[in-house]
Amino acid sequence: MKENNNAEILELKKQFTALQQKCGAKTDTIVRLGQDLEKSENEKKGLAARVETLERNLERSERELQLVCACQNDMKIKFGTERQDLIEDIEKYKRENQQLRTDRQELLDQKADLKKDCKTFRQTIAQFEVEKMGGPVRNSFSTENDEVSKLEAHEKLQAKCKGLESDLRSMLGIKEELLMERDEMQRKVARLSNELSYLLNGDPRRVAEDLDSLVAENRFLKAKLNTAEEESESIKMTLAKYKQMAEAVNVQTMVNRSPKAGEGDDKPSVAVINMKQIRELLASHAIELVESDYRAITTILLDLCNDKQMALAHSRRANKVLGMRLHEVESKLAVLDIKSRSSSPRHELPRDEDIELVVPKAVASTSSK
């Protein structure tokens, strides 16, 4: 009977041990399944966060694309207007050049006519001089009235010749000026043609950015010069004020050091200059202050406050100028970046239908589920 009971107990122990092992295995399986489930949940959250990030990136890219398209349209409109203006300027300069050429031809014709007139007048003067030199052998019946009339005619012709010579000199001067203006206009037309070709071809040698940078630099230097002048004036005023204060302090020190009726050397003289001395003076109990000392301290504190306010105003003005300069530089850099991207064929912007978002397969399957 006991042997049977022992056998049953052993059998029950074996079964209990086997059940414990099975229970441990099931527990391990459940723990592993829980870990796998938690890991899957974490992966699901990470994929969801990645999907949200990609969606935000897509929205931001779309907004940036819209801004770039708007900037490109503005640049196209501005380029069209600038091109039209340059074409109109070139046409106007061509017309002016043609007008100058016609004026030059007219001046040349006038010069030729004046040369012919001068030649005619020289021949007339020479003939008259020959006739005058042959006066002693002329006929005896020539009268004195004929000589007077010939002299008057000769004087008139000489005055007219001098007037024509002066007109010729003035015409030659006008011709030289017109030639200089024509050469200057030709150089200007050539320069504008080069600038137009640079602008049309997108050449980096175009002068638009350089002019803008020069104008901005000039504005910045002008503001800086005004600030320096204001600071110089404020420094001069401060120096004059401190000079007056030093003179007043010296006078007050001399008065306090002089002997007074009813007072000895028990009360020391007070001369306050800076904040450190003011603090030490107010903190010390060995010095007795009167109403005049408090007034002097108040005046010095007020002057210090005014100086601080003036320095703060100057620093704010300088910061404002620097901020404007920084804003201009940033805007110029942005415009240059957009121009370089739009001008180079390697940075052509894709169309709306060519933009695709590459999403991993795992993310796509998770989002579809």
Curated annotation (Swiss-Prot):
Expressed in amphid and phasmid ciliated neurons, and also pharyngeal, touch receptor and motor neurons. GO terms for cellular component: ciliary base. Keywords: Cell projection, Cilium, Coiled coil. The keyword Coiled coil applies. Its main location: other. It is found in: Cell projection, Cilium. Pfam families: CC149 (PF09789). InterPro entries: Coiled-coil_dom-contain_pr_149 (IPR019179). Residues 1-249 form a coiled coil. Belongs to the CCDC149 family. This is Coiled-coil domain-containing protein 149. It comes from Caenorhabditis elegans.
